[in-house]
């Protein structure tokens, strides 16, 4: 990283359980500012539920990157995987880019985002980041 360029920003964006109209205004505005938007897809699925939660919305002109992951209860395997993922985003952050990461439901509730932000902060303790809450499926059902 060069000293003249500040480190980019990482944002976790909870997109809610779907449909798209359950995305918060603050999260939508942040999504518009992202240079790169990453979205998770379980290897056991053909498409990303988090990305589908945005169906019907006019998506921002940004670079989009699918992140595939396996569901695993092996903590060592998860830690290694998310550290590798964090390292793969290193170049984007060192270029000063704003990187968004979509999560289905809420970013901090049973989400891949929690693992990724932990790994990123191990690499960059000074990383500027923000987490945008999303509506969980159980909160949506209760409403």
Feature names for model-found ranges:
Residues 118, 136-139:
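Residues on a specific face of well-ordered alpha-helices
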Residues 141-143:
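Anionic-ligand binding region
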Residues 1-20, 25-130:
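Class I S-adenosyl-L-methionine
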Residues 130-136:
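Active-site nucleophile and cofactor-binding loops and adjacent substrate-binding regions
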């Amino acid at each position: 990283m060069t000293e003249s360029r500040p480190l980019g920003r990482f944002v976790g964006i909870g997109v809610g359980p779907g449909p798209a109209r359950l995305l918060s205004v603050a999260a939508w505005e942040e999504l518009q500012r992202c240079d790169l938007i990453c979205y998770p897809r379980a290897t056991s699925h053909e498409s990303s539920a988090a990305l589908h939660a945005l169906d019907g919305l006019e998506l921002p002109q940004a670079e989009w990157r699918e992140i595939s992951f396996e569901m695993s209860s092996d903590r060592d395997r998860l830690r290694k995987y998310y550290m590798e993922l964090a390292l793969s985003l290193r170049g984007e952050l060192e270029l000063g880019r704003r990187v968004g990461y979509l999560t289905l439901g809420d970013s901090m509730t049973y989400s891949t985002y929690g693992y990724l932000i932990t790994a990123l902060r191990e690499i960059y303790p000074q990383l500027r980041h923000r987490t945008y809450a999303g509506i969980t499926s159980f909160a949506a059902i209760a409403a």
